[in-house]
């Protein structure tokens, strides 16, 4: 069974071209730790377990720990949080000689917190609701469900 969060991410990836056309979408995705590079949304490949930038398995799937190291080097704390929640190995942190102001214990605690906050859920809901054409009924249904969970009407 797939979680509501996974369904939302799948919808975001499926319709990423439409969603990324809007200028504020990138900022929201960056704040959620889901935006990487200029045109990609991060997702874990179901076939190989690596990170995929397209949502499909290919030779371009990237090891999640490599992305974690890149995120730490760029001091992108939100991306670090997201990658750790997605299963990145926090033991790779020692390679970076404390270039980020997070201790090993703080990073370990982030891994155990796999719940998505209502604020994050609302931001994803806003993206899906505001960016997808009305003819996409599944996206709209998902948005209504998410809006109900957030306790807010869009």
Swiss-Prot record:
This is Protein MGF 300-2R. Belongs to the asfivirus MGF 300 family. Plays a role in virus cell tropism, and may be required for efficient virus replication in macrophages.
């Amino acid at each position: 069974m797939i979680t509501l969060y996974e369904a939302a991410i799948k919808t975001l990836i499926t319709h990423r071209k439409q969603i990324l056309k809007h200028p504020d979408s990138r900022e929201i995705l960056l704040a959620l730790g889901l935006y990487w590079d200029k045109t990609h949304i991060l997702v874990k490949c179901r076939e190989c377990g690596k990170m995929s930038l397209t949502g499909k398995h290919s030779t371009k799937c990237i090891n999640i720990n490599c992305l974690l190291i890149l995120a730490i080097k760029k001091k992108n704390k939100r991306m670090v949080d997201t990658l750790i929640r997605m299963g990145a190995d926090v033991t790779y942190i020692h390679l970076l000689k404390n270039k980020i102001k997070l201790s090993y214990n703080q990073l370990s605690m982030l891994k155990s917190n796999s719940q998505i906050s209502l604020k994050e859920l609302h931001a994803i809901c806003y993206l899906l609701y505001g960016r997808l054409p009305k003819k996409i009924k599944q996206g709209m249904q998902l948005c209504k469900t998410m809006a109900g969970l957030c306790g807010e009407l869009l």
